[in-house]
Amino acid sequence: MDGNLIRHSVAFSARLRRDLAAFHVRPAEPGEVAAARDLAAQLIGEGIVTTDELDRVQHLTGRVSLFVTEEEGALCGILAFMLLSGEGLRAVYDGAFDACAPSARHLARPGEIIHAFYGWGVAATTKTSARRVVDGARAVMAGAVGSLPKFARPTTEAGHRLMRERLGFVDLPGSDSGLVWQAPLEAAVAA
């Protein structure tokens, strides 16, 4: 289930940003983290990651965890994900991964090997922004991280539909916590 591993390099980060930029999605600036979290909380609920945790993870991962899109200068959509270390992948399988307060050891930092992708959240206030972040996520999962196992724990009915119907995730065998996953893409593994 590990697929092919990827190094969290400058080239990888540039590819990720370039893939998302094609959909008008860009890394959140440090001053935008609170607004991005507030937007997500309004749409998903307050039981999500805190602003401080989002900011910490964004910093630890070299600004490749929280992305935003705007319309007419207003923040309208967010896409958040984590790139996991080998220890993070094991924590997911063991049920010990805490998405609201991920251990630094569970995150793949710049220069380290990425073992898995964890979809942290998607939220948008308009159909245009929703399309941007979902299409951007789809492009990243088929491209930059296609060779990795991908995980998520949807918390809303809309999130469950998105992950299963539009993104092709299935229940993770043996998980009783609502965790879904997508196997590494064969074409990406072969490439």
Q: Which residue ranges define each predicted feature?
A:
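Acyl-donor binding region in acyl/amide transferases
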Residues: 93-167
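Conserved beta-strand in the GNAT
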Residues: 74-83
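Cytochrome P450 core scaffold surrounding the K-helix E-X-X-R motif
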Residues: 86-92
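Short, well-ordered beta-strand micro-motif
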Residues: 66-68, 80, 180-182
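C-terminal "cap" of GNAT-fold acetyltransferases
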Residues: 174-191
